[in-house]
Curated annotation (Swiss-Prot):
SUPFAM superfamilies: NAD(P)-binding Rossmann-fold domains (SSF51735). It is found in: Peroxisome. This is Peroxisomal 2,4-dienoyl-CoA reductase [(3E)-enoyl-CoA-producing]. A motif (Microbody targeting signal) lies at residues 296-298. NADP(+) binds at residues 19-24, 69, 173, 200-206. One of its GO terms (cellular component) is plant-type vacuole. Keywords: Fatty acid metabolism, Lipid metabolism, NADP, Oxidoreductase, Peroxisome. Residues 279-298 are annotated as: Disordered. It catalyses: a (2E,4Z)-dienoyl-CoA + NADPH + H(+) = a 4,5-saturated-(3E)-enoyl-CoA + NADP(+); a (2E,4E)-dienoyl-CoA + NADPH + H(+) = a 4,5-saturated-(3E)-enoyl-CoA + NADP(+). Its EC number is 1.3.1.124.
Length: 298
């Protein structure tokens, strides 16, 4: 699908994307690169990184892969420093690394709960903390007239209500959203850094979708989604581009929901025509009923 953005909207910028070697993270890496940015992707699996970098470079995108675990502060610092040393600056940080699996709360070990919190919530803060020195206004490599950089945290909508078998992810993403809002307040005020989030819904062709949503459940989910379809990785990448380029220059502290309206939706228990018939019947009975005298003793 063609992009609605001009091909140079992030030209000359440098973006570091955690989890950028696969799924949504790779699509964001690819679209940022196609729109002019230089790309550093971070991940734990060397082969995935190598394949992703090769794919990006085949498109004419300047890209490097950096091994690291977002849970480790030393890895976060090392990857940020390596990005700066290679490209000379850092403009955009996208925290897309995430952990997820299904487990009933009673079957989920404290270690399993902690692991997802560490990847999603602690990992997001580790990367933000390490990147601050290069994202803030007036940082090395930054034009003083251009202001600060931009951070995008990939979240979810699971914690907006409650979700079956994902208490660990719900807790982690709630923490990510709180981090987004608080950093937008503090770092926007002190360092001119914009901080936003994106909460994807079901996105086809991703490891998370294949792991968490079997085909039978996906088909059932479509029945009560307002748009009757799952999203594409492209949808999330376009949201990330909007938040990173000048089109989103006055947006900060927002977690943008990109889920086709799914989290707002509920199964339709009555067809629309049945509702009309029921309403007419109720109205008819109401008019036929004698008004009578008030029966209250008050």
């Amino acid at each position: 699908m063609d992009s609605p953005f001009k091909p140079d909207v992030v030209r000359g910028q440098v973006a570091l994307i955690t989890g950028g070697g696969s799924g949504i993270g790779f699509e964001i890496s690819s679209q940022f690169g196609k729109h002019g940015a230089s790309i550093a992707i971070m991940g734990r699996r060397k082969q995935v990184l190598d394949d992703a970098v090769s794919a990006l470079r085949s498109l004419g995108i300047q890209a490097i892969g950096l091994e690291g675990d977002v849970r480790k502060q030393e890895d976060a610092r090392r990857v940020v420093e390596a990005t700066f040393q290679h490209f000379g600056k850092l403009d955009i940080l996208v925290n897309a690394a995430a952990g997820n699996f299904l487990a009933a709360a009673e079957d989920l070990s404290p270690n399993g709960f902690r692991t997802v919190l560490d990847i999603d919530a602690v990992g997001t803060f580790n990367m933000c903390h390490a990147a601050l020195k290069y994202l803030k206004k007036g940082a090395p490599g930054r034009d003083s007239s251009s202001g600060g950089g931009s951070i995008i945290n990939i979240s979810a909508t699971l914690h907006y209500t409650a979700s079956w078998y994902q208490i660990h992810v719900s807790a982690a993403k709630a923490a990510v959203d709180a981090t987004t809002r608080n950093l937008a307040l503090e770092w926007g005020t002190d360092y001119d850094i914009r901080v936003n989030g994106i909460a994807p819904g079901p996105i086809g062709g991703t490891p998370g979708m294949s792991k968490l949503v079997p085909e039978e459940i996906e088909n059932k989910t479509r029945e009560y989604m307002p748009l009757y379809k799952v999203g594409e990785k492209w949808d999330i990448a376009m949201a990330a581009l909007y938040l990173s380029c000048d089109s989103g220059k006055y947006v900060s502290g927002l977690t943008m929901v990109v889920d086709g309206g799914l989290w707002l939706s509920k199964p339709r228990h009555l067809p629309k025509e049945a509702v009309k018939q029921l309403s007419r019947a109720v109205e008819k009975r109401s008019r036929a009923k004698p008004v009578g005298l008030p029966t209250s003793k008050l």
